[in-house]
Regions:
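Short hydrophobic beta-strand element within catalytic cores of glycosyltransferases
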Residues: 329, 333-336
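A conserved mid-protein helix/loop that constitutes part of the nucleotide-sugar donor-binding site
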Residues: 23, 239-255, 271-277
């Protein structure tokens, strides 16, 4: 197979990250390296410090991890550069670093991911490379990135200016600029991990770029997954934020905890972590609901393996969440709402596991149907394996470059 040089751009990169989008970048980069490709990743350590103020570390300007060349962005202006990038959509520091990397490594493919900390200027095409963008969230069409109107409900009728103000953010005037429109036109292809995302972008983008649906993937399981030492539990994996529906899930265990013959284990952290822990203590749920925070990869696989089901009670329009794919790869069923592209995943197992927000209580209470782990793993093999992703990804690159 022909080998190529890739440059990935991303706001985050593990372990300096918070969500599944950065995990996807890591998975993709490392799998490409295993195949003999050369992969470089440019990401914002300033952005990570902004979201995690207690982080005091620093990184080298270039370091190699698992065969991937990493370029952490650390502006001399620190947070000020982030604010300027947010307000203007561009950063001279980031543009300079990006241009320098293009000249140095001469990539065949530049693949952009979540770039809200980098600015839209990196989308501009400066050479003959394939210029790709994966829409991990709704940043291209929504200043909040999540299509949550006023941060409360899914946006059905746009009122971006007032939504921005009520969300306590400054309006990004550059979104209506000619330069932003021109840069969008420089993207060769937008990868939408869900059909829902593809449809939303097609409806809302001011230009009509080429958009293809290629679902995310997760690597194959480790050969030996240990026992978690937990049993009879539902599992939640994700950030602890309102839009993920985690508060609704914990509330169900408070209201009918004795009617649910299982525990709830919560893996993840976020702004609601302390509030959830206080709620558990206040309502004496310590023997029913457990908040584990972030855990090691080995422990996470063990928890997937031993759980009854992964529960994803999302309020917002999910895209193609990595946690759901990880669960399926272990043979674990997924219970979740039909918001966004989440239902596209769950229906491949059983449509009865797709629930409305007010139906979550009934599904969890009555969850007794046995599911074949092997059949669920077949869903992974068919739709969410790296082999399937690679086939579509390389075909896309070949089409762009011809």
């Amino acid at each position: 197979m022909e080998t190529r040089t890739f440059l990935m751009t991303s706001s985050y990169y593990p372990p300096y990250h918070f969500g599944g989008d950065a995990v996807h970048v890591k998975y993709l980069s490392e799998e490409l390296v295993k195949l003999g490709h050369e992969v470089h990743v440019m990401f914002s350590i300033d952005g990570f410090k902004y979201k995690k103020p207690d982080f005091n570390g620093s990184l080298e300007n270039n370091e190699k991890r698992n065969g991937v060349d990493l370029y952490p962005l650390q502006s001399p202006l620190g947070k000020s550069d982030l604010y300027f990038t947010y307000l203007t959509g561009r950063s001279s520091y980031i543009k300079s670093r990006f241009s320098g990397l293009l000249k140095e490594i001469k990539p065949d493919v530049v693949h952009h991911h979540n770039i809200f900390f980098l600015g839209y200027n990196v989308l501009k095409k400066y050479g003959k490379y394939a210029n790709l963008y994966t829409a991990h969230d709704y940043w291209l069409i929504c200043q909040r990135f999540d299509l949550m109107k006023y941060g409360q409900n899914n946006c059905e009728h746009k009122n971006c200016f007032y939504c921005t103000l009520l969300s306590k953010r400054f309006p990004q005037i550059w979104r209506n600029s000619k330069s932003f429109m021109e840069v969008l036109g420089d993207i060769d292809t937008i990868i939408a991990p869900s059909n829902f995302m593809k449809d939303k972008l097609s409806e809302s983008l001011p230009i009509k770029p080429n958009i293809v649906n290629i679902p995310n993937f997760v690597p194959r399981l480790p050969e030996d997954i240990r026992d978690s030492n937990y049993s009879n539990y539902f599992l939640y994996v994700g950030v602890l934020e309102r839009h993920k529906g985690i508060c609704n899930l914990v509330k169900i265990f408070k209201e009918i905890g004795m009617g649910i013959d299982a525990k709830l284990i919560i893996v993840g952290t976020g702004s609601l972590k302390k509030k959830i822990e206080e709620y558990i203590t206040k309502n004496k749920l310590e023997n029913k609901v457990f908040v584990m925070g972030w855990v090691s990869n080995d422990m996470l696989w063990s928890l997937y393996k031993d759980a009854l089901a992964l529960v994803m009670p999302s309020i917002w329009h999910e895209n193609n969440p990595i946690a759901a794919l990880e669960a399926i790869s272990t043979g674990l069923p997924v219970i979740g709402t039909n918001n966004g592209g989440l239902g596209e995943i769950i229906e491949k197992i059983d449509r009865e596991l797709i629930i409305k927000e007010d139906g979550l209580k009934g599904v969890i209470t009555n969850f007794k149907k046995p599911y074949s782990k092997n059949k669920i793993k077949q869903v992974y093999d068919q739709f969410y394996s790296f082999e399937g992703f690679l086939r579509d990804y390389m075909k896309l690159i070949g089409d762009v470059q011809t």
